[in-house]
Structure formats: structure tokens, C-alpha cells
């Protein structure tokens, strides 16, 4: 807010009536700041230190999910403060308000993980409610942990207020036995310890050193994926995703976001002016070229639905087939977001794709410049290194990529008529046949793995974990990491109607739709059924006839909801299919299953 000043007794007399500050007619905050009938409203603002100058300025909300529950968000008060200062200095009226967060890592492997995807919806709903109720003119949406990012972007799109997306930045890598590590190595260490491949002392050292400070998980996991895609979509300035959480550049990015929020109000630029079908295709191309999280499939579908843009799960596969994987970060590789930042950040990847005609640089961004213009601006004004100046063993030329196709694969077949999602972190030609080992929940599967029962060739099936059936579509990094830690990264497949963490690696296939709860074929599987996973052909099949699948489904008892009251029950009853983004906004419910 502006510097506190002594009240000017003549201020109201300068206009025709109290509260006549000559505000912009376009600003809906006029409804609460202007006119004699709004004197009580202004009195409330004055109680918080706002002055006449503030009340004549655009009211810019800064939703902030700061919390001590996760290192992803523990520093966000400082990030938000820099944004507030930027708004104030640029002539806006900054108003910070809170919203929730869930720590995916801390809730992982517990019943509490069912809250994770629900939190995406609660964040979007809460930001919409506050900005609607308080008649805000614009937003700077601050985000840290995984579901913060799509939740904030959904709110910006749904309200269509001039908005700037602001990521809190990622954590630096930890050090263990002379190598960089992240939280994912700790999860995998649990599996290695259970199999006797890691000592208790080694696991303890890994636990104590993997996470050295504030910031979101460091690899190309869900938070860093969605932050990168915010640049591709145009909702955040180019170069804003990669500065680490505890780096001074992160706070410069935050201050600039605040200044930019005032600009987008003045220039009347809205998310609907920025987002197009092509901007979503750009985001998918970047996701698959960087080996981004499978969660981004779910979130991009939800964002497109909010924007009223036709996007289908098969679009991800079509774009992945034509887009090579050129960045090799964790979990597929060894490097983290900070390594990418040191060579120029997300813009250097976008530039390579754009120069190969795999990314459309003509799309508008929040700055008012196109992607192509933004790249030129970064090169000329901010020292973005040229391609010739980049020497990095984890960033590949488009004509000599890490993999000829992108990392995201959409599989279909009689087990997943509406699709399933896989991120390839290893063999692009993976083909697997084996017997089903069927579990009705994640906990039973985890126990099976930790007790050493899995064998080479197995296909672990975890069902009743979908958006409605879970409810909440839990991530399963615990069990997938345990499989990898037990030495079965390449010879055991895992299928589920739930989700995976962005840190998952190996042949783990999620988002199977329809889910078991609504009668999907995964609900018909029995132990020993022969399953084939064929990545080159993009198929996932069980060796059963359609009539046998139908018979089994007809004979099964209709499932009962896992929860009948409370927030989990409420959102569980609202979720749509994973194949359409698992949205809960009733205006977007066209198919539901």
C-alpha cells in the first residue's frame, strides 16, 4: 500500500462528493471505493492503512498459499511481499489474502493424499470467491507446491481478471555421497532399504541431506513442469520459472510480477486475450520435450476447459509423436531445475523448439509481446545465451535428441477405452507382458512390494483410486519408488486409475479411464489375468474377450462411496473423468465419465 500519510480534509471536497477520486471506469473496484454510499467500505480500508492514493488505484489481489506445512511454500510470504512492493511502486493497491496448500510429499502414501487434487479445486474456488466478493481488478497468483500452480491458473482463467502468474521457485539439490539428490531419491531409498540394498545409516543420511532449504521439489516434477508451462501458455513472463526459491533473482521476478500486474490492468489484457488452442499446443510440446510430469496432462485439460478451449487427451499423444525429447532432467535424468536455470532457463528450450517449427512463437504473452518477441527481448536486454553459447550435457539439439519422440504417451485399449497416461523415463520401445497382481488400494500394493513378493514380469494393478472412487485420485510415488528401489524399474509394470508424482519413473501407467468406480474395465481384472503393455503401439490390453469383461462387470457389486460427508465426499461427488481433467466446475461438466 502507499506510504501512510496524514488525512487530507479537503480530499473529498476536490470532487463533487465523498469518494470522487477520478477512477478508471473499467475498474470494478469502483463498486467498493467510490461514491458517498461507499464511505463505510473506505473506512474499512483506511483501518488497514490504505489512503486516498490507494483508493484511486487498481485493486490488485495477491492470493498467497504460504504455510509451514511444506518447504515448497515456507518462503512464500517473502515472495508475495516482493510482489506487493512491485504493485505499490507501480501505482496499484495491493491486497494480500490467503488460501490453502497441501504438501504432496508429506501426504504421500497416506489417506491424506486424497486431499491433494481436491486442493487444486479449493484453491481455484477460494481465489475466485475472494476476488469476486471483494471486487478486485487484477491478480498476482502466487504458487509453491504442486496443486497450487494449476489451482491459481484455473482461478485466473475462470475470473478472466488481468493476471500474472508467480511461481515461488524450486529447492536446490541436496548432496548424498557426492551426488545431487532430491526427495525422489529418498522415496526410492525406502524401497532399497526394504530389500536390503541400503543400510539404515545410508537412508538416514539421505533423509537428512536431500532437502536443504525452501522451494518446490527440484526435478522436472509437477511444480516445475507447471511453472515451465505457465511460460509456454503466456500466463507468466519468459524466464520466470527457473530462478531458485532462495536466489535473489526469485525476488526480482516477484517484484516485476507486481509491476506487470498494474500494466496488464492499464492495458486491459486478460487471460482470454492470451490463451488459444495454439498456446495449449505449445505447452504440450514443451511438456513432452522436457519430460514433464503426467499430472500436467490432467491440469492442462482442466485449464483448457476453464478457458473454453477444445483440448483432448489424444492431442497429447499426437504432439508427443512429433516432438522429440530434448531436455533430460530428473526423474529420467540426473539434473534439476537449477541446472536448467544456469544455462538460461525454460526460454532456451522453447527457442530450440520454435526454431524447429515445433512451437508457435506468434502467441501472445502476459507482457503484451509474443513469445518470439519475448525471446528477442531476453537476448538483447537480459543476456539470454545464444544456442552456440550453451554447453550442457542434458539439453540436446532437436535434430539429435535424447529421444526421437516426446516423453508423454497416451495408451488406449480394452483396459483403458478413454485413455491412460505414461511418461517414458527409460526405454521408448518398452513392451511388457505379464500376470496381473490386483490390489483394491495403494496400501495393500505397498505392503506387497515391501514384503518382497513382486517378481520380474508382474503387472501391479491398483484400482479404486480414481477421481470419484478414491476419491481424489491419489499420487503413488511411495509404491512406484518402492518398485524402482527394489530393482524392478524395467521388468515390472504398474497400472492404476489413480495418479503418479512427477518424480515417478519406470513403466507406470496412470489415469486409466473410465475408472473402476464408474464401471471401467480395470474393475473387472482378477489376479493372473494376462496383460500386455505396448508403448510403440500405444496399447494396454488384457487377454479377455469383451463379453467376459462385460460379464465380470455385471456381476460385481456396485461400489459404495468411500466417504459420505465432509470435503472429500463433496468434491468426490463432483469430479469428472481423468480423461477430461477431473474438473469439478459444474459449468464444465459435459461428459463426466
UniProtKB/Swiss-Prot annotation:
Residue numbers spanned by region Disordered: 1-40
Active site residues according to the UniProt entry: 501 (proton acceptor)
Pathway(s) where this gene product acts: Amino-acid biosynthesis; L-isoleucine biosynthesis; L-isoleucine from 2-oxobutanoate: step 3/4; Amino-acid biosynthesis; L-valine biosynthesis; L-valine from pyruvate: step 3/4
Keywords: 2Fe-2S, Amino-acid biosynthesis, Branched-chain amino acid biosynthesis, Iron, Iron-sulfur, Lyase, Magnesium, Metal-binding
Binding site for Mg(2+): 104, 146-147, 475
Pfam families, alphabetized: ILV_EDD_C, ILVD_EDD_N
Reaction equations catalysed: (2R)-2,3-dihydroxy-3-methylbutanoate = 3-methyl-2-oxobutanoate + H2O; (2R,3R)-2,3-dihydroxy-3-methylpentanoate = (S)-3-methyl-2-oxopentanoate + H2O
GO MF annotation, one: dihydroxy-acid dehydratase activity
PROSITE patterns xref list: ILVD_EDD_1, ILVD_EDD_2
Sites where the protein binds [2Fe-2S] cluster: 72, 145, 217
Domain of life according to the entry: Archaea
GO biological process, one term: isoleucine biosynthetic process
Ranges of Acidic residues composition bias in the record: 1-17
Cofactor binding description: Binds 1 [2Fe-2S] cluster per subunit. This cluster acts as a Lewis acid cofactor.
Transmembrane segments: none
Biased composition (Basic and acidic residues): 22-40
Enzyme Commission identifier(s): 4.2.1.9
Cofactors named for this entry: [2Fe-2S] cluster; Mg(2+)
Annotated positions of the N6-carboxylysine modification: 147
InterPro entries in the record: DHAD_IlvD/Edd (IPR050165), Dihydro-acid_dehy_C (IPR042096), DihydroxyA_deHydtase (IPR004404), DiOHA_6PGluconate_deHydtase_CS (IPR020558), ILV_EDD_C (IPR056740), ILV_EDD_N (IPR000581), IlvD/EDD_N (IPR037237)
Subunit and interaction comment: Homodimer.
HAMAP family from the UniProt entry: IlvD
Biological role stated in the UniProt entry: Functions in the biosynthesis of branched-chain amino acids. Catalyzes the dehydration of (2R,3R)-2,3-dihydroxy-3-methylpentanoate (2,3-dihydroxy-3-methylvalerate) into 2-oxo-3-methylpentanoate (2-oxo-3-methylvalerate) and of (2R)-2,3-dihydroxy-3-methylbutanoate (2,3-dihydroxyisovalerate) into 2-oxo-3-methylbutanoate (2-oxoisovalerate), the penultimate precursor to L-isoleucine and L-valine, respectively.
Family designation: Belongs to the IlvD/Edd family.
NCBIfam families assigned: ilvD, PRK00911.1
UniProt-recorded name of the protein: Dihydroxy-acid dehydratase
Organism: Natronomonas pharaonis (strain ATCC 35678 / DSM 2160 / CIP 103997 / JCM 8858 / NBRC 14720 / NCIMB 2260 / Gabara)
Lineage of the organism: Archaea, Methanobacteriati, Methanobacteriota, Stenosarchaea group, Halobacteria
Amino acid at each position: 500500500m502507499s506510504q501512510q500519510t496524514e488525512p487530507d480534509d479537503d480530499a473529498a471536497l476536490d470532487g463533487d462528493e465523498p469518494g470522487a477520486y477520478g477512477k478508471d471506469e473499467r475498474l470494478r473496484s469502483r463498486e467498493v471505493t467510490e461514491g458517498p454510499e461507499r464511505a463505510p467500505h473506505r473506512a474499512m480500508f483506511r483501518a488497514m492503512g490504505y489512503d486516498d492514493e490507494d483508493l484511486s488505484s487498481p485493486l490488485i489481489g495477491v492470493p498467497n498459499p504460504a504455510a509451514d506445512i511444506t518447504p515448497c511454500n515456507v518462503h512464500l510470504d517473502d515472495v508475495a511481499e516482493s510482489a506487493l512492493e512491485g504493485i505499490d511502486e507501480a501505482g496499484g493497491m495491493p491486497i494480500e489474502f490467503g488460501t490453502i496448500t497441501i504438501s504432496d510429499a508429506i501426504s504421500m502414501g497416506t489417506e491424506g493424499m486424497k486431499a491433494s487434487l481436491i486442493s487444486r479445486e479449493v484453491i481455484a474456488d477460494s481465489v475466485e470467491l475472494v476476488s469476486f466478493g471483494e471486487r478486485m481488478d487484477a491478480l498476482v497468483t502466487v504458487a509453491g507446491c504442486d496443486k497450487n500452480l494449476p489451482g491459481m491458473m484455473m482461478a485466473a482463467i475462470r475470473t478472466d481478471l488481468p493476471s500474472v502468474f508467480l511461481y515461488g521457485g524450486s529447492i536446490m539439490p541436496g548432496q548424498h555421497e557426492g551426488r545431487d539428490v532430491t526427495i525422489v531419491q529418498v522415496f526410492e531409498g525406502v524401497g532399497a532399504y526394504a530389500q536390503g540394498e541400503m543400510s539404515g545409516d545410508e537412508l538416514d543420511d539421505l533423509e537428512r541431506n536431500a532437502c536443504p532449504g525452501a522451494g518446490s521439489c527440484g526435478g522436472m516434477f509437477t511444480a516445475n513442469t507447471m511453472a515451465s508451462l505457465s511460460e509456454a501458455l503466456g500466463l507468466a513472463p519468459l524466464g520466470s520459472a527457473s530462478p531458485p526459491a532462495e536466489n535473489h533473482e526469485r525476488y526480482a521476478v516477484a517484484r516485476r510480477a507486481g509491476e506487470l500486474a498494474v500494466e496488464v490492468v492499464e492495458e486491459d489484457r486478460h487471460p482470454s486475450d492470451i490463451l488459444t488452442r495454439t498456446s495449449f499446443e505449445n505447452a504440450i510440446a514443451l511438456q513432452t520435450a522436457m519430460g514433464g510430469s503426467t499430472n500436467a496432462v490432467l491440469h492442462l485439460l482442466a485449464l483448457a476447459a476453464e478457458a473454453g478451449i477444445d483440448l483432448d487427451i489424444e492431442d497429447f499423444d499426437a504432439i508427443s509423436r512429433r516432438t522429440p525429447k530434448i531436455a533430460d532432467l530428473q526423474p529420467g535424468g540426473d539434473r534439476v531445475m537449477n541446472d536448467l536455470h544456469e544455462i538460461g532457463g525454460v526460454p532456451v528450450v522453447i527457442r530450440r523448439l520454435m526454431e524447429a517449427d515445433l512451437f508457435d512463437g506468434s502467441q501472445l504473452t502476459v507482457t503484451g509481446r509474443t513469445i518470439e518477441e519475448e525471446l528477442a527481448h531476453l537476448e538483447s536486454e537480459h543476456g539470454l545465451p545464444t544456442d552456440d553459447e550453451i554447453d550442457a550435457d542434458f539439453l540436446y539439439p532437436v535434430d539429435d535428441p535424447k529421444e526421437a519422440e516426446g516423453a508423454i504417451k497416451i495408451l488406449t485399449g480394452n483396459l483403458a477405452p478413454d485413455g491412460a497416461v505414461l511418461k517414458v523415463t527409460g526405454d521408448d520401445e518398452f513392451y511388457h507382458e505379464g500376470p496381473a497382481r490386483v490390489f483394491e488400494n495403494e496400501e495393500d500394493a505397498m505392503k506387497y512390494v515391501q514384503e518382497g513378493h513382486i517378481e520380474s514380469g508382474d503387472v501391479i494393478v491398483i484400482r479404486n483410486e480414481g477421481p470419484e472412487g478414491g476419491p481424489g485420485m491419489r499420487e503413488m510415488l511411495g509404491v512406484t519408488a518402492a518398485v524402482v528401489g527394489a530393482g524392478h524399474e524395467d521388468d515390472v509394470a504398474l497400472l492404476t486409475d489413480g495418479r503418479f508424482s512427477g518424480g515417478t519413473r519406470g513403466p507406470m501407467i496412470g489415469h486409466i479411464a473410465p475408472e473402476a468406480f464408474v464401471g471401467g474395465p480395470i474393475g473387472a481384472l482378477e489376479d493372473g489375468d494376462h496383460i500386455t503393455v505396448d508403448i510403440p503401439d500405444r496399447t494396454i490390453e488384457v487377454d479377455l474377450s469383451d463379453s467376459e469383461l462385460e460379464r465380470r462387470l455385471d456381476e460385481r457389486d456396485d461400489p459404495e462411496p468411500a466417504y459420505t460427508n465432509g470435503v472429500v465426499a463433496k468434491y468426490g461427488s463432483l469430479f469428472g473423468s481423468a480423461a477430461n481433467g477431473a474438473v469439478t466446475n459444474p459449468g464444465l461438466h459435459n461428459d463426466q465419465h
